[in-house]
């Protein structure tokens, strides 16, 4: 497949998606079948209000979205996701126009939203959006003047709009990918570590906990007030949490809940 540098900007009308020009003449439903992982989260760098998501938010990065003929599913999708998705090709549009419509602006408003969000896209480039309609449920949130969309940045990478005026970069996962947590699985010794090393979802959440902890440390240092004591308190809190997590032993549901809650807690502390 020829690689196209296209634009991925979000919006969802009862679950819509937009895909890039390389899919313009193909069966997009077949081309995107498989597992995709959230690689990056983009938020408006000029927004001074308290955000729902932060840049590369650990709540979203690492989450897997499954596309198949009958559904679109994943832990970050609302309820049961999108049932019986269909893909409707839209007219070509520039990245700037697509982002303006998603934000509720006039299509030809002289904004530079691609730059404001730090998106890996060029505002003047043209993309071919595909709307994804769901027989029931939804994929992502609707934009202000356009539905949810997906476009191809390059082969194996998609961009789509998401909740709270954010955007997600999705990367295709190879078949039979091995779990890769934040620690070396060769050294896994406890039931908890072994469970994490045998499950891609748990391994992803383990990476997210590590990422969220790193963000919390950086935030404490950036504020530069009582840094030593706050870092000490954070470390104690993390060690206590690890003990609680290990009480789950190999219970996957318990581990998933513990890690999701910890990620949310650490991210909230960093806002």
Give the predicted meaning of each segment.
Residues 1-6:
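Positively charged n-region of N-terminal signal peptides that target proteins for export
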Residues 7, 94, 102, 126, ...:
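Residue-identity detector for threonine
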Residues 25-26, 31, 41, 47, ...:
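N-terminal alpha-helical modules
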Residues 10-19:
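Bacterial N-terminal signal peptides
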Residues 43-44, 67-144, 232-235, 243-247:
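Contiguous, well-ordered beta-strand patches that form the walls/edges
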Residues 25-64, 106-177:
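Lipid interaction determinants
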């Amino acid at each position: 497949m020829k690689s196209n540098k296209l634009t991925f900007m979000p919006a969802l009308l009862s679950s819509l998606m937009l895909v890039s020009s390389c899919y313009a003449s193909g069966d997009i439903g077949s081309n995107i079948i498989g597992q995709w992982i959230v690689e990056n989260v983009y938020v408006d760098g000029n927004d001074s209000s308290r955000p729902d998501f932060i840049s590369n938010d650990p709540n979203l990065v690492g989450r897997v979205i499954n596309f198949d003929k009958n559904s679109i599913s994943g832990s970050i999708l609302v309820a049961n996701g999108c049932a019986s998705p269909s893909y409707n090709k839209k007219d070509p549009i520039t990245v700037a126009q697509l982002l303006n419509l998603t934000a509720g602006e006039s299509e030809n408003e002289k904004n530079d939203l691609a730059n404001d969000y730090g998106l890996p896209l060029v505002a003047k480039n043209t993309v071919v959006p595909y709307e994804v309609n769901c027989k029931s449920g939804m994929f992502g949130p609707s934009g202000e003047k356009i539905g949810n969309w997906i476009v191809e940045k390059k082969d194996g990478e998609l961009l789509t709009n998401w909740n709270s005026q954010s955007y997600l970069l999705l990367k295709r996962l190879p078949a039979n990918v091995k779990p890769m947590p934040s620690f070396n699985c060769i050294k896994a010794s406890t039931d908890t570590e072994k469970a994490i090393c045998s499950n891609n979802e748990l391994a992803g959440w383990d990476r997210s906990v590590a990422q969220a902890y790193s963000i919390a440390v950086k935030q404490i240092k950036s504020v530069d007030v009582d840094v030593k004591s706050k870092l000490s308190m954070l470390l104690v809190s993390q060690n206590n949490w690890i003990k609680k997590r290990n009480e789950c032993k190999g219970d996957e549901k318990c581990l998933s809940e513990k890690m999701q809650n910890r990620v949310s807690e650490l991210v909230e502390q960093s806002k």
